[in-house]
């Protein structure tokens, strides 16, 4: 049963059900030797990695999780196409969830029909042990003719042994045919195969077998996964044969036969004394899945997350502030007074450093979202939110992309590919940018930290943290009402049904969490960092030129000269030009400059204010907060008050200030109309909300 290919360089296709530990295992095998991209012609993320072991170089492709070699969503179609259209020499590493063995084996049976060398890594052994049962892998190996091996991706147990197996020439085995198809079906398949050429015979065999599931033949008309691999003549012949004969094999018959076969195998392979009533919900699920208390629990968990963002990040933020200040001082000691020193200290160090200070909060956000995902809570929150979101025209399938937007809208929008219903998917894409993302946090933290008091309510929750949580809730509520409007106008259709199998509770893998935070933080810095650096240098030039003649102001201090310089600069004139439009929502010309630059990326607002207020490398972020509070207009009144600060927060909550988001919307929708529509409606919403709140506030103040 072995596969004798001894090549030291080969490719492995990793397949398995969602939430089976496949991606965690992928991280354990490849570490940091990963790269991401997109599959050709689609926007589905492609995760590839390499690991070296015993003089072997193994390339691993982590395929999207799926339950079968079918499905209508874009990511599941990719899994089908890659596996069915595998390249010569490819091997399949199937990741099987031992706690959901029957479901995993349903998918494995389909993969075995491809006749490709397979090795099975079995996860969730600890879940079985808690139920006091064991899964005998030796019986499964004998039944299918392939090797099964336990591995724990969370703590690394069995990883070395799995690597040894992977590079062993006898590890990946060609399966023996075990599934007992009835003779009538076999005769039909063989008859059809004999009438076609032998090209792609293994893949063709699977396509034909899988086609028997469809009673109506509808999938054949839409394009069965894998059918496009063959030329027009075989495809036409397949359709004709199935029209006359193939339809008599129904999906229910297929499912029933396989289910009986799998249950028979597992009746012998699963041994032990199982805990009675194991299907009864745990005490935690009785609360977390409750229609009311589940929603309350979700809000409470998110409130604690934002509380931690403020309290836990304080020390590392202070440390980064100190580092930025010391770097500015160090560089300044080697440079003479002049434009170059100003550029490096105020433009580069001050501009970029002002955003780097908020890295601890962004990292904590990525960490908390990763923990919620790995523990299995996100799936439960999706279940609870399904009923609530149904009132607004969406299903629980939209919840995970929306919650992912709390980190970044770009991968969240790409994550909507799992939504089969096109109107639901497009609606989710258009409302996802309303969710508070990590790029908004630097602006929120700066303004909230400067304007709102740092005191506790009930001795637990910080006022600033509650304000941040309120902005998160505002984004969620706005996205729901926007979805309702879109579903009642542009996308009038029924929402898709939401079916989900709740995963077992898991202890998060520290290594997997660290890799997740590292990759997301790296992506954030590599994309936003380049834009911030470019805008900071450009803005420094616009804020410092044309130079004023300081001799005309002999009695003014350096700080007063700095104010005049910025006011008379290119940036100052641009802000003054925008001021009539921004004044009704409470913004002065300095805020106007920040608004203009932040349309490239929201976090640039902080860099812009840092440069405009002359906070350079020798200052800290606290000095920027003080500069905001001390700033006065021509009449001596404070520029930054509670009313226009709230107006600014609302503008940033609703405006689409992210070129990357607009770019990915264009790519996902394959249309220029929808990103333009997104930008327009969010800008109008942001301005209108800020205008109403500021004007009403002024009316009653």
Swiss-Prot record:
The UniProt keyword set, sorted, is:
Cell inner membrane, Cell membrane, GTP-binding, Ion transport, Iron, Iron transport, Membrane, Nucleotide-binding, Transmembrane, Transmembrane helix, Transport
GO molecular function terms listed in the Swiss-Prot or TrEMBL record: ferrous iron transmembrane transporter activity; GTP binding
Query: Could you tell me which Gene3D superfamilies the record lists for this protein?
Result: P-loop containing nucleotide triphosphate hydrolases (3.40.50.300)
Give the chief site where it resides.
Answer: membrane
* FeoB-type G domain span: 9-172
| Subcellular localization(s) per the UniProt record | Cell inner membrane
Against Pfam families, the record matches this protein to: FeoB_C, FeoB_N, Gate
Give the GO cellular component terms, alphabetically. plasma membrane
Q: Which PROSITE patterns match?
A: G_FEOB
Listed name of the protein: Fe(2+) transporter FeoB
Q: Which gene encodes it?
A: feoB
């Amino acid at each position: 049963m072995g596969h004798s290919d001894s090549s030291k360089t080969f490719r492995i296709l990793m397949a398995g059900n969602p939430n089976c530990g496949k991606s965690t295992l992928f991280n354990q095998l490849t570490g940091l030797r990963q790269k991401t991209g997109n599959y050709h012609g689609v926007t589905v993320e492609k995760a590839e990695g390499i690991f070296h072991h015993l003089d072997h170089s193994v390339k691993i492709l982590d395929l999207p999780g799926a339950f079968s070699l079918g499905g209508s969503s874009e990511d599941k179609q990719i899994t089908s196409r890659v596996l069915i259209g595998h390249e010569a020499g490819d091997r399949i590493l199937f990741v099987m969830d031992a706690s959901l063995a029957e479901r995993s084996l349903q998918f494995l049976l389909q993969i075995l029909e491809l006749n490709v060398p397979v090795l099975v890594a079995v996860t969730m052994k600890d879940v079985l042990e808690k139920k006091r049962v064991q899964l005998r892998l030796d019986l499964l190996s004998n039944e299918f003719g392939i090797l099964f091996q336990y591995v724990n991706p969370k703590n690394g147990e069995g990883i070395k042994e799995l690597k040894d197996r992977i590079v062993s020439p006898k590890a990946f085995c060609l399966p023996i045919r075990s599934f007992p198809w009835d003779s009538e079906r076999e005769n039909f398949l063989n008859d059809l195969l004999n009438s076609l050429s032998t090209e792609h015979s293994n893949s063709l065999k699977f396509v034909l077998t899988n086609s028997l599931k469809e009673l109506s033949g509808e999938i054949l008309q839409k394009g069965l996964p894998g059918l496009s691999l063959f030329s027009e003549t075989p495809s036409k012949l397949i359709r004709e044969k199935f029209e006359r004969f193939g339809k008599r094999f129904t999906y229910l018959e297929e499912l029933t036969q396989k289910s009986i076969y799998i249950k028979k195998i597992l009746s012998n392979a699963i041994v032990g004394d199982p805990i009675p009533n194991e299907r009864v919900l745990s005490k935690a699920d009785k609360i977390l899945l409750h229609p009311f208390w589940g929603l309350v629990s979700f809000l409470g968990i998110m409130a604690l997350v934002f509380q931690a963002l403020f309290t836990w990040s304080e020390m590392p933020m202070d440390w980064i502030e100190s580092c930025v200040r010391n770097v500015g001082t160090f560089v300044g000691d080697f440079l003479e007074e002049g434009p170059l020193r100003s550029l490096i200290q105020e433009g580069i160090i001050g501009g970029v450093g002002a955003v780097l200070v908020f890295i601890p909060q962004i990292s904590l956000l990525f960490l908390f979202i990763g923990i919620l995902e790995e523990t299995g809570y996100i799936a439960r929150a999706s279940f609870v939110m399904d009923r609530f979101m149904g009132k607004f025209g969406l299903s629980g399938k939209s919840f995970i992309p929306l919650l992912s937007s709390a980190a970044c809208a770009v991968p969240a929008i790409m994550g909507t590919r799992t939504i089969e219903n096109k109107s639901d998917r497009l609606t989710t894409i258009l409302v996802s940018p309303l969710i508070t993302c990590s790029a908004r946090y630097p602006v929120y933290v700066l303004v909230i930290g400067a304007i709102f008091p740092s005191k506790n309510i009930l001795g637990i929750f910080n006022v600033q943290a509650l304000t941040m949580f309120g902005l998160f809730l505002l984004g969620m509520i706005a996205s729901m009402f926007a979805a309702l409007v879109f579903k009642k106008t542009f996308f009038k259709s029924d929402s898709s049904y939401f079916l989900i199998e709740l995963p077992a509770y898991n202890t998060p893998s520290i290594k997997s969490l660290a890799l997740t935070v590292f990759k997301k933080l790296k992506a954030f810095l590599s994309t936003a960092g380049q834009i911030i650096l470019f805008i900071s240098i450009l803005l420094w030039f616009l804020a410092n030129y044309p130079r004023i003649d300081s001799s005309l102001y002999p009695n003014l201090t350096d700080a007063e000269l700095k104010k005049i310089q910025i006011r008379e600069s290119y940036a100052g004139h641009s802000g003054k030009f925008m001021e009539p439009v921004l004044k009704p929502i409470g913004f002065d010309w300095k805020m106007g400059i920040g608004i203009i630059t932040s349309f490239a990326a929201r976090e640039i607002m902080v860099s812009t204010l840092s440069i405009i207020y002359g906070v350079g490398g020798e200052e800290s972020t606290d000095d920027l907060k003080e500069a905001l509070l001390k700033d006065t207009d021509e009449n001596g009144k404070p520029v930054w008050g509670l009313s226009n600060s709230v107006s600014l927060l609302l503008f940033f909550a609703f405006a689409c200030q992210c070129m990357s988001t607009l770019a990915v919307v264009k790519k996902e929708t394959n249309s220029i109309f929808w990103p333009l529509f997104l930008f327009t409606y969010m800008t109008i919403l942001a301005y209108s909300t800020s205008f109403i709140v500021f004007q009403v506030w002024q009316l009653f103040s």
